[in-house]
């Protein structure tokens, strides 16, 4: 493990416009193991992944709209889903339009808050529970 020595940044932080850190890596790993995404290959750097129907349903249980067809930003060259290498965990977390929606949703629902003057994202206990409840279905 490399990266920040600050435990809060290791735990959860913003990477551009999406979640990174231990919690984000665990979420993406759990989603992959539950068949939410199909990764053709995951090289050392970022790569596109495909959101599968079961993943669309899981995101809906979380309250996240996974429809990319009506979103003008999503219809740009930006991928809908992308695996982004987490530099502190050396494993992938979720990026792209869906990754950004996940971060926005967590903040809007009050599951997490941005730490002042930091990239750290602090999850409340109920927020972390809610984030993983969709996998219990």
Give the ranges of each region predicted by the language model.
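Long, charged, low-complexity, helical-prone intrinsically disordered regions
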Residues: 1-137
């Amino acid at each position: 493990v490399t990266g920040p020595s600050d435990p809060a940044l290791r735990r959860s932080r913003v990477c551009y416009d999406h979640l990174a850190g231990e919690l984000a890596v665990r979420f993406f790993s759990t989603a992959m193991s539950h068949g939410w995404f199909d990764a053709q290959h995951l090289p050392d750097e970022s790569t596109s992944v495909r959101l599968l129907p079961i993943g669309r349903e899981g995101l809906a249980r979380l309250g996240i709209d996974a429809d990319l067809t009506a979103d003008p930003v999503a219809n740009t060259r930006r991928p809908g889903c992308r695996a982004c290498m987490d530099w502190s965990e050396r494993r992938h977390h979720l990026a792209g339009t869906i990754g950004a929606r996940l971060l926005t949703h967590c903040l809007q629902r009050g599951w997490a808050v941005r730490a002042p003057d930091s990239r750290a994202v602090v999850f409340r206990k109920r927020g972390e529970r809610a984030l993983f409840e969709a996998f219990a279905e």
